[in-house]
């Protein structure tokens, strides 16, 4: 399942630390309540569904489950949810005429247990079949089987589809709804003739096994391979498709389904998807197992996409590319999501997790390969360079004491959905990337080949992965200090990550001391967690960044380790963690930071681009954390005036955004704005608004960073040009802005409060059915500074007649929160007042957590904390587990921001005054001009 879910659940990565004994007892109690008893298991399901999208309340179904008792039993416990059980029969192969069913109970709590009691004991290992007739409710939150709609020629068209991961197959049919309890599935869907496109995981059968039913067309599908319940999928619609039958790149039938009239937007998915499948098959040395691949784009979908085996379902914006409308970023995201889901065909489908405790075995590998395997077929996208930026971002959520580790026991449905978070995705993917480099890429690949072949169609635990990787390592000449299982168990069962502090043992020595400790945002907290940390380095006298295998290991058993670095005595500077392949931060002695600033400002291209990004990111975050003086971070940042590569700018941008937030309202804020305008001036001239011939694929991202800083912080040329572009578009619809700068152009044109511009863009939103364009407009509309229009926009979240789909409504709040400090405060008041109305009107499970997590990144003061207190007082009784975790994250971040201001605001102000305040020489701003810029910014923003 792609990361639109986990991005909204970053807060759910946080938990309440318990003692070992408390944790163990709690887990035992939860397991007893929620985990199915290991007294029987399924081998085969025969599911019949009667689905009419025109009837939106419920559907009828029946299922026959062939089971094997492990012991003699007199009751069978499975899962069922949100359904009425009409009849149950239990029969054996030995005597199929004897019905052993006595009675049943269906739990009304979130255990969702259906307990079937029998008239007598049934014997261990004797196959039996459970027959159940039921009526199930369509899900109203897009988790389960649900009805979606779209507009076509002025009329509303219905379709039915599904999202069963992680615990919602039980809403489609009674089943053993745990990932390890795999079986073969036979599916038959009866649908009205008006719905011609009916799909499931396998192709339709050529023979007929089931009777016809009046008023329905029967669609019988071939039996699946052994698979988990959560991978079953359905689509009943009028969709059309394009396919690879005429010119196949990939030898298996490959189709892309979408709304009628959108088939031209599916061409990229068809081409890229096939190319990527070939690359993954070659890498894994294991063929895709199913006889077809369908990709379907549906208008309403809870996740970004879902890897159902043979029928992968996507949100439209995650699959369809419309030339001239889809941005470079969205197109890249579509490629990455396609690769993510393709990867799951091996990591998740072919080899699945033993339980959702090991969600990272699915999502961590999918996160890694969505970048690594996209790089195979689109190297110009620089996905593995961009991966480092994503890793730096996840450091933020992984730097709190309460964060859960990769392997984290979960039992309840809410706990399980909470595992689909930044830890399971981006952190796990980052640790896997580190694993690849410390094993070396080819040995790592060989280990994965062994893993997939050894565990095909089975349920795996991390230990199974480690055994396979160890075998590949043992068959090579490469050595590491401890077994894979020892090293990886530390990384997967401990939350957080280390910071290494490296300093020379003596001025002329050829060695360094390296100390590790857990990196925590709140330094008043402590942790004894330690790791086996692979390290490598570059010194100024021997600049080689290409070999990323370990040159040494920092062991968890020693507080500090002396590491020999030959040639260091003759080196001006040194860098640890080549290409930032290790999942950790690095701090240095002050002399080395000064030397790094010097080399960056004199000849930055000597240093690998990923290490330039690492140095910038580490420096600002270590300064934020009180481990480094801000002067050192700012001196390093000066080199960015000369930096023409996107990646270091992408690393710097979050630090600049953080300082923008915490300095807002401070005496130094206008100096800070001038510092950024000065820093970005060369790239503003170089990039401008217009695309140039031969630009890199990632240049649009770079342009957006530079233009955003300049338009937001008062560069009149930037603001005027943005307004000119929008006005030209208003005058002539054929002069549509370049999609890559549309959000920036629209947002900049709204900041002045122009009502006409807002209404123009809102009417654009109402008039488009393209999901990419809708996303751009939703992101921009929150930028308005007009109070009446902003309130109108926020109220679209709770307006039952709003044109904004529920799955997108959280974007309204996110847009307003991110627009400006004023917008954030208005949005905070709105959420405090209306949380009980927002919660049922945004996407279930993720909408409100997405909003709260956006606040977590922006709330900084004690006044904000008081508002959160009010939110809790008024609405705590309806908070979900994810919402509670997000509130905890908000409080922690506010406390950290207050502490930052107390410790660092004066330091930052002094540096800015010394370097950008009057009178400080050639680079300084005169007092009069500073006043003018301050006045203009104030007028423009208000």
From Swiss-Prot:
Keyword set, alphabetical order: Aminopeptidase, Cell membrane, Disulfide bond, Glycoprotein, GPI-anchor, Hydrolase, Lipoprotein, Membrane, Metal-binding, Metalloprotease, Protease, Signal, Zinc
Cofactor(s) required, per the database record: Zn(2+)
CDD domains, alphabetized: M1_APN-Q_like (cd09601)
EC number: 3.4.11.2
Catalyzed reaction equations: Release of an N-terminal amino acid, Xaa-|-Yaa- from a peptide, amide or arylamide. Xaa is preferably Ala, but may be most amino acids including Pro (slow action). When a terminal hydrophobic residue is followed by a prolyl residue, the two may be released as an intact Xaa-Pro dipeptide
Keyword Zinc in record: yes
The keyword Zinc-finger is assigned to this record: no
Location relative to the cell: Cell membrane
PROSITE patterns: ZINC_PROTEASE
Protein residues bound to substrate: 304-308
Bilayer topology annotation: Lipid-anchor; GPI-anchor
Broad class of enzyme this protein falls into: hydrolase
Signal peptide residue numbers: 1-15
Site (Transition state stabilizer): 425
One GO MF term: alanyl aminopeptidase activity
Active site: 341 (proton acceptor)
Binding of Zn(2+), residues: 340, 344, 363
One GO BP annotation of this record: peptide catabolic process
One GO term describing the cellular component: extracellular space
Cofactor remark: Binds 1 zinc ion per subunit.
Pfam families associated with the record: ERAP1_C, Peptidase_M1, Peptidase_M1_N
Family, similarity comment: Belongs to the peptidase M1 family.
Subunit note: Binds to CRY1AB5.
Protein name: Aminopeptidase N
Gene name for this UniProt entry: APN2
């Amino acid at each position: 399942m792609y990361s639109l879910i986990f991005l909204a659940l970053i807060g759910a990565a946080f938990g309440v630390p318990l003692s070992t004994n408390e944790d163990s007892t709690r887990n035992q109690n939860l397991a007893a309540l929620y985990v199915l008893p290991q007294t029987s298991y399924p081998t085969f399901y025969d599911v019949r569904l009667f689905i009419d999208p025109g009837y939106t309340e419920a559907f009828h179904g029946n299922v026959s489950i062939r089971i094997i008792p492990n012991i003699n039993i007199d009751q069978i416990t499975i899962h069922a949810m949100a359904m009425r059980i009409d009849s149950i029969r239990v029969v054996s192969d030995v005597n199929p005429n004897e019905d052993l069913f006595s009675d049943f109970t269906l739990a009304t709590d979130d255990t969702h247990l259906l307990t079937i009691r029998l008239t007598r004991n049934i014997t261990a290992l004797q196959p039996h079949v459970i027959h159940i007739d039921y009526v199930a409710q369509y899900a109203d939150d897009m988790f389960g089987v649900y009805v979606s709609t779209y507009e076509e020629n002025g009329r509303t068209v219905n379709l039915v589809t599904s999202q069963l991961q992680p615990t919602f197959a039980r809403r489609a049919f009674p089943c053993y709804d745990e990932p390890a309890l795999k079986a073969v599935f036979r599916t038959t869907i009866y649908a009205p003739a008006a719905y011609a496109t009916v799909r499931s995981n396998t192709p339709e059968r050529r023979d007929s096994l089931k009777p016809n039913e009046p008023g329905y067309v029967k669609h019988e599908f071939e039996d699946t391979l052994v698979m988990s319940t959560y991978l079953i999928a359905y689509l009943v619609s009028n969709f059309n498709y394009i396919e690879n039958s005429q010119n196949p790149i990939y030898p298996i039938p490959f189709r892309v389904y979408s709304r009628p009239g959108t088939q031209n937007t599916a061409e990229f998915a068809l081409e890229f998807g096939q190319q990527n499948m070939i690359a993954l098959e070659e890498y894994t040395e294991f063929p895709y197992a199913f006889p077809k691949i369908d990709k379907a784009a549906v208008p309403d979908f809870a996740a970004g996409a879902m890897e159902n085996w043979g029928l992968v379902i996507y949100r439209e914006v995650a699959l369809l590319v419309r030339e001239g409308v889809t941005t470079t970023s969205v197109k890249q995201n579509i490629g990455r999501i396609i690769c993510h889901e393709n990867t799951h065909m091996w990591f998740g489908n072919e080899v699945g997790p033993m339980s959702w405790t090991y969600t990272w075995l699915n999502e961590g590998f999918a996160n890694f390969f969505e970048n690594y395997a996209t790089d195979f077929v689109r190297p110009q996208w620089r996905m593995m360079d961009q991966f480092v930026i994503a890793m730096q971002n996840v450091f933020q959520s992984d730097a709190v004491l309460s964060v859960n580790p990769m392997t984290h026991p979960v039992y309840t449905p809410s706990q399980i959905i909470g595992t689909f978070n930044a830890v399971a995705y981006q952190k796990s993917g980052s640790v896997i990337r580190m694993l690849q480099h410390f094993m070396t890429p080819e040995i790592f690949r060989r280990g994965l080949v062994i893993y997939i072949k050894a565990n095909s169609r089975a349920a795996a635990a991390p230990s199974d992965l480690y055994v396979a990787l160890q075998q590949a390592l043992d068959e090579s000449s490469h050595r590491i200090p401890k077994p894979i299982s020892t090293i990886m168990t530390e990384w997967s069962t401990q939350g957080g990550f280390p910071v290494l502090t490296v300093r020379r043992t003596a001025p002329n020595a050829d060695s360094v001391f390296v100390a590790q400790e857990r990196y925590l945002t709140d330094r008043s907290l402590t942790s004894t967690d330690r790791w086996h940390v692979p390290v490598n380095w570059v010194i100024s006298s021997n600049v080689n960044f290409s070999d990323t295998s370990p040159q040494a290991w920092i062991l968890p058993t020693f507080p500090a380790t002396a590491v020999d670095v030959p040639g260091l005595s003759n080196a001006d500077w040194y860098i640890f963690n080549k290409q930032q392949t290790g999942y950790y931060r690095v701090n240095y002695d002050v002399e080395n930071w000064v030397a790094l600033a010097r080399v960056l400002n004199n000849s930055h291209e000597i240093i690998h681009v990923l290490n330039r990004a690492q140095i910038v990111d580490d420096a600002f975050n270590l300064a934020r954390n009180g481990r480094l003086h801000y002067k050192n971070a700012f001196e390093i940042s000066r080199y960015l005036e000369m930096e023409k590569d996107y990646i270091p700018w992408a690393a710097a941008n979050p630090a600049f955004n953080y300082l923008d937030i915490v300095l807002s309202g401070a005496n130094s804020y206008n100096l800070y704005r001038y510092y950024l305008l000065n820093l970005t001036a060369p790239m503003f001239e170089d990039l401008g608004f217009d695309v140039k011939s031969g630009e890199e694929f990632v240049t649009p991202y770079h342009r957006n960073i530079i233009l955003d800083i300049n338009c937001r912080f008062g560069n009149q040329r930037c603001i005027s040009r943005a307004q000119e572009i929008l006005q030209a578009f208003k005058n002539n619809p054929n002069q549509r802005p370049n999609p890559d700068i549309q959000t920036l152009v629209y947002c900049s044109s709204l900041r002045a409060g122009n009502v006409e511009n807002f209404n123009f863009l809102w009417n654009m939103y109402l008039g488009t059915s393209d999901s990419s364009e809708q996303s751009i407009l939703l992101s921009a509309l929150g930028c308005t500074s007009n109070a009446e229009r902003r309130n109108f926009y926020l109220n679209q979240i709770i307006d039952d007649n709003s044109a904004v789909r529920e799955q997108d409504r959280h974007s309204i709040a996110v847009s307003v929160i991110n627009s400006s400090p004023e917008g954030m405060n208005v949005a905070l008041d709105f959420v405090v007042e209306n949380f009980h109305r927002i919660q049922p009107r945004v996407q279930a499970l993720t909408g409100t957590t997405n909003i709260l997590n956006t606040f977590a990144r922006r709330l900084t003061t004690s006044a904000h904390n008081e508002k959160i207190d009010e939110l809790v007082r008024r609405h705590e009784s309806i908070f979900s587990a994810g919402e509670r975790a997000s509130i905890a994250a908000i409080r922690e971040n506010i406390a950290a921001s207050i502490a930052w201001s107390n410790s660092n605001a004066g330091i930052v102000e002094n540096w800015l005054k010394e370097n950008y305040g009057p009178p400080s020489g050639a680079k300084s701003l005169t007092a009069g001009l500073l006043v003018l810029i301050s006045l203009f910014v104030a007028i423009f923003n208000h």
